[in-house]
């Protein structure tokens, strides 16, 4: 590439530039740089250092007109001044100058009308490998004419020593200058920052063009029927959308415009903790040469122990979507027939599957509920409720109601059916009940996708007023209505009221006067 392009973004005396290396070359560099371990599957395994997850409290957006008029400022979207941004940009430039660099050009967005050209600059080979896996890889012809619309400088070896003086959270910084189409990262090596940073930008660009951006997976059946799977991390988006009988469009980030649904990415980023080839064969078999494992434990023979979470429970693998045999090559499909909201309810209250009204769909979309299991100091574990608007609040620069309005319009226009599926616990909360089996969850999903769920008779649950099928295929009918699955009915009722209160408390932020988004009537009602 022309060095003047790097000089234009302030990088000086750059050494060798490894521009758009192929997989074999990247892996060779990773090995030579001692950045990775080669595993028996052919995949490379890397450690992301101190940070094995994103650093949301270190993410800032430059407070500048006109973008500051649209951004929902707060805990998710924190302000940083132009002066501090310029200072940290200089820190990153200094780190990357006089170094050998890896420059990778990719696209975000499979739609011709909505795709953005992105350039990543880093001094770490595996990070170039990661973005090559995760984003859409341009053709040779496209690369010849490539002009980046947005650039990411990853100076992960640099830190902000003046973070206290700047009034920031820590020495780590993940910064976005929307007007100058630039992102700067320092202090963290974690690959997910590269992926989710661009997702945040797509969530800014698209809705302003009246296109919906979504934190969801998507697949399409043989008859052309598209399904979307919304859910927070750990709810099963990747697992459940990776189906041998349906073509995978994508596992995490999508747009929805007048032509239909399209992937933002060209790869998958799957959790691999406790990965079992029998339960998830498509993902297991995707881990081969070209795949990049993060923070897994590898023995001296190069064998991976997927059950070992000693480095982190958030062990991951990125791989190009082509590693999934049954993927949709266009990365796009028509308008969805079904939308599925996934919640891993560790309280064991939500049904395995329920049919939502239009109002309930809006309520549960804005609530974005799941529950995680967190350890306490004494080693006791208990569920913790998590509410993340639109199932992805951490990545939404605009107010959640912007995305909700677009979703509601599209549900109405295309007559989409919406369901809530609990991939969490049944028969009791975490520690008492059991985790919903993948077999039963897949049976629920299959009944939605093949339409057989519509033939069921439905009951309405108390408190949450969710419509649940009385029978569904070979699933034990006792678990379909969650109260029936609990042996201790009094404990169920108490836990139900507790969870209902959490939902109601969370939704108060949308209950403002004259709000068109006050869907609280569709939420749970505690019965005296």
From Swiss-Prot:
EC number, UniProt record: 4.1.1.49
InterPro entries (UniProt xref): PEP_carboxykinase_ATP (IPR001272), PEP_carboxykinase_C (IPR013035), PEP_carboxykinase_N (IPR008210), PEPCK_ATP_CS (IPR015994)
Key words, A-Z: ATP-binding, Cytoplasm, Decarboxylase, Gluconeogenesis, Lyase, Manganese, Metal-binding, Nucleotide-binding
Binding site for ATP: 196, 215, 231-239, 280, 316, 441
Disulfide bonds: none
Positions annotated to bind Mn(2+): 196, 215, 252
Binding site for substrate: 54, 190, 196, 316
Main location: cytoplasm
Pathway connected to this protein: Carbohydrate biosynthesis; gluconeogenesis
CDD domains named among the record's database cross-references: PEPCK_ATP
GO cellular component term, pick one: cytosol
Keyword Ribonucleoprotein: no
Cofactor binding mode and count: Binds 1 Mn(2+) ion per subunit.
First-level EC class: lyase
The protein's required cofactors: Mn(2+)
Compartment(s) where it occurs, according to its Swiss-Prot or TrEMBL record: Cytoplasm
Free-text function comment from the UniProt entry: Involved in the gluconeogenesis. Catalyzes the conversion of oxaloacetate (OAA) to phosphoenolpyruvate (PEP) through direct phosphoryl transfer between the nucleoside triphosphate and OAA.
NCBIfam families named in the record: pckA, PRK09344.1-1, PRK09344.1-2, PRK09344.1-3
Similarity comment: Belongs to the phosphoenolpyruvate carboxykinase (ATP) family.
Protein name as catalogued: Phosphoenolpyruvate carboxykinase (ATP)
Gene: pckA
